[in-house]
Amino acid sequence: MNSMSSGHLLSRSLLKLPMSVLVKGTAIPSNPIQDLDIDTHKPVIYALPFRSNVDLLTLQTHAKEAGLPDPLEPLMLNGKAFQRYVFIASRPTLLSSDQHVPSDSIALFSELLTEHKLDSELDVQVIPATVLWGRKPGKEGQERPYLQALNGPEKALAVLASGRDCLVRFSPVVSMRYMADTHGTDASIAHKLARVARIHFSRQKLAASGPNLPQRAQLFARLMNSPAIEKAIADEAKSKQIPLEKARKEAHDILDEIAADFSYSLVKKGDRILGWLWNRIYQGLNINNAATVRRLAQDGHEIVYVPCHRSHMDYLLLSYVLYHEGMVPPHIAAGINLNFFPAGPIFRRGGAFFIRRSFKGAPLYSTIFREYLAELFAKGYSVEYFSEGGRSRTGRLLPAKTGMLAMTIQAMLRGLNRPVTLVPVYIGYEHVMEVGTYAKELRGKRKEKENAGLVLRTLRKLRNFGQGYVNFGEPIPLNQFLNETVPQWTQDIDPMGESKPQWMTPTVNKLATRMMTHINDAAAVNAMTLCATALLASRQRALARDNLIKQVDCYLSLLRNVPYSATSTLPSESAEKLVEHAESLDKFVVETDTMGDIISLDRNQSILMTYYRNNIIHLLALPSLIAQLLIRQQSVSLEKVQATVAQIYPFLKQELFLRFEAEELNDLVLRYVAELARQGLVTVEGKTVTLNQAQTQVLMLLGRIISETLQRYAIALNLLVSCPHLGKAELEEKSQEVAQRLGRLHGINAPEFFDKGVFASLFVTLQEQGYLDDQGRCVLETAKPLSRQLYALIYPEVRMTIQESLCQVDA
């Protein structure tokens, strides 16, 4: 290629100083080599959408920071020098707008394709890169393209206004070797390459800014005139015997209560405030698997984020993370309890739309909410809702409330023209600021109503909260899910949105279980969850420091060597470092004697720590069950281990949203036993597994993770067998009473141990698994062996308490 003109060189050198002051950009992804799988040993060139020295210099800064080649350094191939960047369109001037592909770009593509023809080993990687000056979405009704070239004065204004809100987006590489091998190397291929890049750039802009935003008044007018809402207004007027105009005003007020009023400037300001806040209270935010979501956004998917709900912080954290990962903050379904001054208006402008706790007896509200949600989907705005319905008070994932999921599928039944994908999100913290309040609520204290005073009191408590985690789980493409589950679903498409086919409820329930399972699959293990799990497993909630480190190391090794899922994450530090870090969060009592440190939990902290243990209990449930069986039996055949796991697994799967299918269990048991043997906790001779007496404590503490859950199952099954005449409601009530008694006598503090809802779900699983018949009566021939097996798995003193309590119930 010919050498660069001195004019361009002079222009760039003059721009460097002002740009170093005015421009502070963010690269997306922050680590493009790893996230985009770029091979740094292969030659690289960059493709930019428009001819612009400002964009090129901004790209240069971020490419070098990321460890990529300098775009202004020539590319040497077979002794020839090539320019390392191409522009896909010329920059417009004030007088003309040339959007054609520049001839020098076509020439460069053509020459590089020729080089591939001559050298079969050559593979030049083209990295499409876009420099976005500001991410403000357009207004509805504007017909401008998403990505526009800026002339000189426009670019100067953009740099002044948005230099510190600049985004450099690197896209997945395009292999010129693949292009040459698949499509040939003639001149038309160079044009095709340019066209592909142009489409790509438009999608990048859409993914970063989102679709054009509606004017609120226009949105209201459109919805109020929709056939479904007009019909609901007429029905409301008729049923309440009020004038039509009064019903219309009621509908307008409902819409005003629900609808978001998204403001980009508030999001931009909020980003700075939240950045300060996270740096003040968290030592770091760990974000995983965001690249998967970016790809979905770029491919034009309608994204529905479905996070678990641990804290009010979740609302802010996920929007902040998405914005920083170069995506649009979603419209968030928030509980109406958060619509108080001043938080309500701020949340609303940040994208929140408000939802009442119940739609019962409010057909007008139900229709308006459904229509509003369908409008968000139709226009392509990403949406977020917490399907647990409220914050988890115990740290365990709650069964999903399925209303929003059903409305999502109903929106699809209107014939959406883009694929809809659920993105499960696991949000984890080393400290949940409301955890003390949750413990009080579980002990019977009334939930405090959200208000400005409560917010200020919470803000005063902000201090060192350790690490925060946002893990994006495996997406669930809804079109694909429906094709597999209900192949004929498209026959029920109804543009009016009134379609409620028979398959809806069972399909939504199946989807809800899959969604919650994918959230749990993406769990983040951290220092606090590991230490809480180990300390709570010891009878006195206390361990010598060395033993705590050894126990944490056992858990880490199990999770590293038998990975739970592809989306769960583990800390990279050693067990010793993790214990040190957990200690720094001031949750433990540390006492020192002549033999070393003892780390313990006081009574209050041991209740709070169950929250963090429950965040990861599902990851260790199966190895814990195997360990408990070995502790109780000392020596047992592999076949017996597999049979016991198979017998109890359906209950654990339902309660903890475990991911494995029944047919995977035998192999999984062998892998866990092999890992326990590798750690020296057991020995395997032939088909027999035997406990290593020298390592009993580690195995015992591992087994005790799941022991409270097994005690709950033992109560329910043995009550069922000894009182077969009791109905389902009575069984649930009596089980809860026995559990409360057992908790008091044996010092069990875990709030979920006495939870009526957990027992209710357990009896549903008993029926599904054939331990209860259709009338809810005990099937003794299946229930009796399981009740005996559960008794065998729990400690004798606990078994005696349960037996004594059941005798009193039976009496």
Swiss-Prot record:
Keywords, in A-Z order: Acyltransferase, Cell inner membrane, Cell membrane, Lipid biosynthesis, Lipid metabolism, Membrane, Phospholipid biosynthesis, Phospholipid metabolism, Transferase
One Pfam family of this chain: Acyltransferase
Location(s), subcellular: Cell inner membrane
E.C. number(s) listed in UniProt: 2.3.1.15
InterPro entries, per database record: GPAT/DHAPAT (IPR022284), GPAT/DHAPAT_C (IPR045520), GPAT/DHAPAT_LPLAT (IPR041728), GPAT_PlsB (IPR028354), Plipid/glycerol_acylTrfase (IPR002123)
BP GO annotations: CDP-diacylglycerol biosynthetic process; fatty acid metabolic process
Motif stretch (HXXXXD motif): 308-313
GO cellular component labels: plasma membrane
Major site of localization recorded for this protein: membrane
Catalytic reactions of this protein: sn-glycerol 3-phosphate + an acyl-CoA = a 1-acyl-sn-glycero-3-phosphate + CoA
GO molecular function: glycerol-3-phosphate O-acyltransferase activity
Record membrane topology: Peripheral membrane protein
Pathway info: Phospholipid metabolism; CDP-diacylglycerol biosynthesis; CDP-diacylglycerol from sn-glycerol 3-phosphate: step 1/3
Family: Belongs to the GPAT/DAPAT family.
HAMAP family documented for this protein: Glyc3P_acyltrans
Domains (record comment): The HXXXXD motif is essential for acyltransferase activity and may constitute the binding site for the phosphate moiety of the glycerol-3-phosphate.
Protein name: Glycerol-3-phosphate acyltransferase
Species of provenance: Vibrio cholerae serotype O1 (strain ATCC 39541 / Classical Ogawa 395 / O395)
Lineage of producing organism: Bacteria, Pseudomonadati, Pseudomonadota, Gammaproteobacteria, Vibrionales
